[in-house]
Amino acid sequence: MKSIIPIMAISMALTSVSVTARKHKEPKPCIPILAWYSIPAGEFATVERYQELRDAGFTLSFSHLYKYEDAIKALDLCAQTGLKSVFMCPELESNPEATVNKVKNHPGLGAYFLRDEPSNKDLPALAQWARRIESADKEHPCYLNLLPVHAFASSQEYITHIQLFDSLVHLPQFSYDHYPVNQVGDSVFLNAQFWNNLEIMSREARQRNKPFWAFALATAHGSYPIPTADHLRLQLYADLAYGAQCLQYFTYWNPGTETWNFHQAPIMQDGLRSSVYEIVKQINREIQARADVFLGAHVTSLFHTGNDIPMGTHRLTTLPQHILKLDTHGQGALVSCLTNNGTNYVVIQNTSVTKPLQAEVSTDQHMKMVLPDGSRQPASSYGSLHILTPGNVLIFEEVQ
């Protein structure tokens, strides 16, 4: 369990107020949810805008800030609103020890940002930088984000990149981005490498007993459409079913449109909310209602069903324990088995981004269903036919 301490520490920090107020109750688990390209410096850096971020279900704010004073203000605003900030500024790189010593005890600090999507040649310098930061602060993790698999010529080259990153930079967690939902004309489809990327990252993280962080795309650009609830559910529940311990959205605030035509982020460039803001808020609330299933969970098996299963995945040939029947009638589904604090779970996800799934699932008397509001009901209270909207999940919990 030592490997998930950085994640759990961030999560527990966000519930410290409620724990103090309710000393005799266990804190409600909270999955860390990170807003990439968060609130910018300047006129929008206010308590009200940070509270708006928190109200949408985020726990970590990562603003791209290029002045020390702006980074300190972000720490202050995060502390005031129960958030944590991923800290970045030029001084963190030019004078890491002195800068870290100034901020390491700040209540708004969550992590230190190093770099996005480094190449192999960048890793030795990043390792030296990380060691300098860690020499001054062993409590808050350094953070960087890795490339997706399709940035490499082959899956094996990607695996080598991950392994080289871990051997050299050796951070407490892995993080990578992969934005799978594409649209060409009226056709919406998943990148063929999406599930392969999850397979690789989940496996590499488990082999090293480290958590991994994964993404959902919240901002349209290029061939990536304006996200719907179905699009976000597919990405986020897939991340969680594969064992991700922190969820990240790219982006929260709309970046400049000059290069990538970013548009319809949850918060647009003028500071107004788009319709995506309410979708993100809804999905985050839904995910946190079942956080006790996923936060701290360990993957025990991952399989797919369907006439054709995705690249890099494995076909389900044996039913999970207590599942008597599972028939998806040739459609694709992910079947993830998790264990968390002595309790076993089976997560069944519709892997289509466009089509509902009719799944026939029967269990024995040792299973409960974990409903979207987090409540539990005996699985025997329901019929065997379950209709899952695109990306959605059924969650079964073994009765203790």
Task: Label every model-predicted segment.
Residues 22-365, 373-400:
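Glycan-processing catalytic domains of CAZymes
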